């Protein structure tokens, strides 16, 4: 049975717990999404968390993703509980960094990024709250590249369910409109020298090679949407299932 562990991280009020709820709902683990402001979020189990509307303790849930079981860890977003968040990083295979499309990259976002770099954790990025007025998708993406890493790439419409990467127009309302497949492929290829050489040789990107570049923290897939409205969540989950790799544990691995 294949398994891997993801952690949901964010600056405060980016919608981290709402994203966790959306993931569990979309994968059939919840019949109804809870809301932080309604004090009925599934993963906010302590009375103090529900009263204050913040996550204080890391929580765990397991959901199916194709033929893989994914363990999700919802971590505190408030800077006062950073020690609790950092404690979970040591067990993660991948991190999902939530950024508010309304607020953009915050100081705490950069702190989280430095911690993820220190622990060498591969990262998927979800830009949330894109349904709010005044959000600028291109500006947020440019800020992510400038303040976090130039390897942050918009993965709207990128498909990895075949041996070779393919591209299609995304149906998500906050995805890029009419992206040029060749331009998208080149942006991915330039994140790694070996990947670029292979792409220049035959004009294709092998999906396994892209998975490796993501795992090696040279490429950071980025998605846009609204967790509260379930926009972009399904596309993100599909990509997570296609591009995340399960760790190889030996038979004698255990606590």
Regions found by a protein language model. Give the residues of each.
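Structural and coupling elements of P-loop NTPases
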Residues: 1-255
């Amino acid at each position: 049975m294949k398994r891997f562990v993801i952690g949901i991280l964010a600056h405060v009020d980016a919608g981290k717990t709402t994203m966790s709820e959306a993931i569990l709902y979309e994968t059939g683990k919840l019949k109804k999404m809870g809301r932080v402001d309604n004090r009925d979020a599934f993963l906010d189990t302590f009375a103090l968390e529900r009263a204050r509307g913040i996550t204080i303790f890391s929580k765990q849930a397991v959901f199916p993703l194709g033929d893989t079981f994914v363990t999700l860890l919802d971590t505190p977003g408030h800077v006062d509980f950073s020690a609790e968040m950092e404690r979970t990083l040591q067990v993660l295979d991948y991190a999902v960094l939530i950024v508010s499309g309304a607020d953009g990259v915050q100081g705490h976002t950069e702190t989280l990024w430095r911690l993820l770099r220190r622990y060498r954790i591969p990262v998927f990025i979800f830009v949330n709250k894109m349904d709010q007025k005044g959000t600028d998708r291109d500006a947020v993406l440019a800020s992510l590249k400038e303040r976090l890493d130039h390897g942050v790439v918009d993965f709207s419409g990128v498909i990895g369910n075949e041996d070779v990467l393919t591209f299609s127009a995304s149906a998500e309302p906050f995805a890029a409109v009419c992206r040029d497949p060749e331009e998208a492929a080149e942006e991915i290829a330039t994140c790694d020298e070996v990947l670029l050489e292979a792409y220049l040789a035959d004009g294709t990107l092998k999906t396994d090679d892209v998975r490796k570049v993501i795992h090696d923290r040279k490429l950071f897939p980025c998605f846009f949407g609204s967790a509260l409205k379930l926009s972009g969540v399904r596309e993100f989950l599909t990509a997570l299932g296609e591009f995340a790799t399960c760790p190889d544990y030996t038979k004698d691995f255990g606590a």
